[in-house]
């Protein structure tokens, strides 16, 4: 049994779903309900984490840290172990009380062949994007005006594909200065965000995460927009952001999505 406000990393038996090990994460703040963010709408607390090639969970937390947690190989004799913690709190904007911003998503930069991940990318619910140097812990951030983020992002060889409530971006890091990385915008494509948030959506904007199709040179980015009366499946070129097609989905005034796009083979 766990408290409803708690945030916990769990290792479960794949067959029985029995809890094998747990790791306590910082709990959700009571301030989020004050700003109208109910628990089912809160996107932080480590929900969007990933496992790396060393079987470590890379977890964003409610107190704006990034945790690297080793998953136990044998939970009968081992437990989760904190390997490293990156403090992101100084790089998350302070908002007027009682509003809070929170790191919600993290993904690795595409690693060079034969090398470990050099940087972690993260994003907050208020639309701040950051890059953490995995070795030094140095942090670089970027924000696009008043745009906010509802969905996870995608990683390609050629950059990071990020979607806000207003536009789709391809972002990169300019590391030409050995002491200061800089986040740059390769391209931006606005989409139809509609007149209001649809049922099941959190914001007025797309409800789907970014999906990459094909290769960096001739592949596509797949999203849905938030157009009224029907949302559209939209495809853009990964290379330059050019829109390739836009197809309306479902019935008038009965469309919306909160899931990533998959093909017939669930890929």
What residues fall within each predicted segment?
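Extracytoplasmic/lumenal domain signature
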Residues: 1-43, 65-267
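Short, conserved beta-strand segments within well-ordered enzyme catalytic domains
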Residues: 24, 50, 58-60
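N-terminal membrane-targeting/anchoring modules of bacterial envelope and secretion proteins
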Residues: 46-52
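Acidic, Gly/Ser/Thr-rich repeat motifs that build Ca2+-stabilized beta-propeller blades
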Residues: 55-58, 62-68
């Amino acid at each position: 049994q766990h408290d409803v406000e708690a945030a916990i990393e769990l290792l479960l038996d794949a067959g029985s779903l029995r809890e094998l090990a747990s790791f306590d994460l910082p709990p959700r703040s009571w301030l989020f309900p004050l700003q109208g963010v109910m628990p089912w709408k809160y996107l932080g607390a480590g929900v969007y984490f990933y496992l790396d090639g060393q079987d470590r969970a890379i977890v964003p937390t409610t107190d704006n840290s990034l945790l690297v947690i080793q998953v136990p190989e044998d939970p009968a004799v081992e437990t989760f172990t904190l390997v490293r913690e990156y403090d992101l709190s100084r790089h998350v904007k302070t908002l007027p009380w009682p509003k809070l911003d929170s790191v919600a998503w993290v993904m690795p930069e595409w690693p060079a062949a034969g090398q470990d991940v050099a940087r972690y990318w993260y994003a907050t619910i208020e639309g701040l994007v950051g890059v953490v140097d995995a070795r030094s812990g140095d942090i670089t951030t970027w924000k696009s005006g008043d745009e906010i983020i509802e969905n996870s992002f995608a990683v390609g060889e050629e950059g990071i594909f990020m979607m806000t409530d207003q536009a789709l971006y391809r972002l990169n890091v300019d590391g030409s200065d050995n002491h200061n990385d800089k986040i740059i915008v390769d391209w931006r494509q606005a989409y139809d965000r509609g007149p209001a948030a649809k049922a099941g959506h959190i914001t007025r904007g797309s409800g789907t995460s970014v999906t990459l199709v094909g290769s960096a040179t001739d592949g596509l980015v797949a999203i849905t927009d938030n157009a009224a009366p029907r949302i559209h499946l939209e495809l853009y070129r990964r290379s330059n952001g050019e829109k390739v097609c836009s197809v309306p989905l479902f019935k008038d005034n009965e469309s919306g999505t909160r899931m990533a796009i998959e093909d017939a083979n669930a890929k």
